[in-house]
């Protein structure tokens, strides 16, 4: 399928056999921008710097919390691990879920005493960041401070988030909370104001699979006394937000750690990487187009009947 899409989208880039659908026409424009490697090289890191400087300029925990909703609506990093997806008990209804922050290492087991792979992977991650962050004008002292704080917070986080094995036990993850009870777990976060600005109302309930995170870690993490740690994670998140869109050197460098984890020896060719990046916001439209092109009406009817 990937080779087919490379062929088809290559034709679209050359102005051949262009789709009539307006959404797909926007995909063609977006893909053309993402695949303009000369323009990406010329721009360097300039497109990333406004976000990085905005995050650097945050002056306090109160300043941070006052901008949570604005960051959420703009797709900027804000360390708010919430999502909307179907209710386990009623798949026809979408509900709010309270997840957890992500770990650096692949699973909590890598943080256990005696695990030799954990420190090895963490060293690879840190080395990658020490090469990557200078590209965004972070000084050597800033980089050390950010990485020291992020790694320390990550080690503490690992004590409270679910392991991969625990996450697989779906029947044990359904913990509904009344909204008032949930927001009381993190009293320093203005969650009522956050959700009112983001969705126009406060939720009435929330499903919390990551109870340990919210009960034992989040109250300490989301606090004014922990601002320096939060700020470090935000600055790192701001830098990483742009890596797939910038120069080829940065794209390849930013994938070193993930390639180590997955055992992939070489980075993907830039043409394939650009297509994958462009496909993300248009996946549904492209899927419908592919089905219409490759499935006969009879095959479509057969699938619909089975569903």
Regions found by a protein language model. Name each.
Residues 1-6:
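N-terminal mature-domain "stem" immediately C-terminal to a signal peptide or N-terminal signal-anchor/transmembrane
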Residues 7, 11:
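Charge-dense polyanion-binding interfaces
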